[in-house]
A protein has these predicted regions:
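A conserved beta-strand/loop element that lines the FAD pocket in flavoprotein oxidoreductases
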Residues: 1-9, 58-59, 117
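Glycine-rich loop(s) and the adjacent beta-strand/alpha-helix scaffold that form part
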Residues: 32-134
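Short, well-ordered coil/turn residues at beta-beta hairpins
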Residues: 27, 60-61, 66-68, 171, ...
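A glycine-rich dinucleotide-binding beta-alpha-beta segment and adjacent secondary-structure elements
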Residues: 285-370
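Glycine-rich phosphate/pyrophosphate-binding beta-alpha loops
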Residues: 122-127, 181-187, 333-338, 365-376
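An anion/pyrophosphate-binding glycine-rich loop and adjacent beta-alpha core
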Residues: 104, 110-284
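A conserved short coil-to-beta-strand element within the FAD-binding core of flavoproteins
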Residues: 4-22, 27-31
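Internal hydrophobic alpha-helix adjacent to the cofactor/substrate pocket in enzyme cavities
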Residues: 106-113, 379-392
Length: 392
């Protein structure tokens, strides 16, 4: 049976930091879309528990399984691993999967340890993604107005097929990297499955065999810049800047669903566009007057020369000169969780002394120590936990 629309807040244990887990406490958190009065309901109703009290406690008969989806939506939590990830970096999919770290925090309160913390910032770097869409906070996934959660998503965004059509600027109104470069180099880009690439699994000489590929877009996007201010020194948002000619080349159809209010702007001049950016809650830095126009003029000069003297964008092709002009949110988003609760081979949660917390299990992105995400990770943990938890 399933109890939906409740948020787990607390785990009970026989002693504050000792003994078996006993149950949980949760509070009622229905999802009500803007303009509606009734909460969203699951498409599956068979076996669901009809319960709407403000809070509930549930006794655990066999055990407790934490599978709360990770912590990259919790700004203070994720900054323990990567201080750069201040609030402007939105969670990809956060509208429907908040990844608030609640499972980790509840387990830590009864003594659980964290694990694999370096993975969050230093491994595949899947925790940070450069979204394919601009103009909406959910830059990682596109949604249509027909979606049942459209009231939370609010915009489809625009898919950028060719970054020769746009430039990306930081909160100070300056370019910061070659816009055509992808994010972090991982997977097949180094010839992992290409014999001609020279890669041999487990061979420490790979780094000398393979020509390095410089793909530091995300590091550049997260770097302290002219607009960063204490105490947190936020990198601030990034904006895709383009003109009407780019819209035709990209074959975009701009309508009321394309961009989210406060994250997509249009103006007749670049100075007017720059002023509108201050309407975004994360654009805290006020650019010097004329900054955006100066940046575009410099880039247009590179187009005339055919050489990007600042960031080596290959043969910049198109000037940004035909109004109206546009600015679309293209800020790097957070995504996968690789740091989480410490578990053993049976997916039992382990405390700071390396001892198992009896009856407590964790799987999926709330469990730490993994360097790979995806359904395989979830299925494997679910299989193991299912076999173990029934033993009581």
């Amino acid at each position: 049976r399933f109890l939906f629309n409740y948020h787990m807040d607390r785990i009970f244990r026989e002693q504050p930091l000792d003994g078996r887990v006993l149950g949980i406490e949760a509070h009622y958190t229905p999802t009500i879309l803007p303009g509606q009065t009734k909460p969203l309901v699951s498409w599956k109703t068979d076996g669901n528990i009809d319960f709407h009290e403000p809070s509930v406690t549930v006794k655990a008969r066999k055990g407790i399984v934490i599978a709360t989806g990770g912590n990259t939506g919790n700004v203070e939590f994720r900054r323990m691993f990567d201080p750069r990830l201040t609030s402007e970096f939105q969670l990809g999919g956060g509208e429907w999967s908040p990844q608030d770290g609640s499972g980790e925090l509840a387990a830590m309160a009864i003594g659980a340890a964290l694990w694999g913390c370096c993975n969050q910032a230093m491994n595949r770097n899947g925790a940070l993604r450069r979204g394919a869409f601009v103009g909406s906070r959910t830059s990682y996934v596109a949604w249509k107005p027909q979606s049942p959660i459209w009231g939370k998503v609010k915009a489809t965004g625009l898919f950028v097929g060719n970054w020769q059509d746009c430039i990306a600027v930081n909160q100070a109104g300056k370019r910061f990297y070659d816009e055509t470069k992808p994010a972090y180099p991982n997977g097949t880009c180094f010839g992992f499955f290409d014999k001609s690439g020279g890669y041999v699994h487990g061979d420490w000489r790979n780094s000398s065999k393979i020509k390095p590929q410089f793909r530091n877009y995300i590091d550049a996007a997260c770097a302290i810049n002219e607009g960063s201010q204490g105490p947190d020194w936020e990198a601030g948002p990034q904006w895709a800047i383009f003109d009407s000619a780019a819209i035709k080349r990209e074959q975009w159809k701009i309508d009321e669903n394309s961009g989210e209010e406060g994250y997509f702007f249009k103006a007749d001049t670049l100075d007017e566009l720059q002023e509108k950016l201050t309407q975004n809650p994360y654009q805290k830095f006020k650019m010097p007057k004329g900054r955006l126009a100066e940046t575009v003029a410099r880039y247009n000069a590179f187009v005339e020369k055919g050489v990007d003297e600042d960031f080596d964008k290959p043969k910049p092709r198109y000037k940004i000169e035909q109004g109206p002009f546009y600015a679309a949110w293209c800020t790097v988003c957070t995504h996968d969780t690789y740091a989480g609760l410490r578990v053993n081979g049976k997916n039992q949660v382990v405390d700071m002394a390396g001892k198992v917390i009896p009856g407590l299990y964790c799987g999926g992105e709330s469990a730490g120590g993994a360097t790979q995400h995806g359904m395989g990770r979830c299925f494997t943990a679910g299989y193991i936990i299912g076999a173990e938890v029934v033993k009581g």
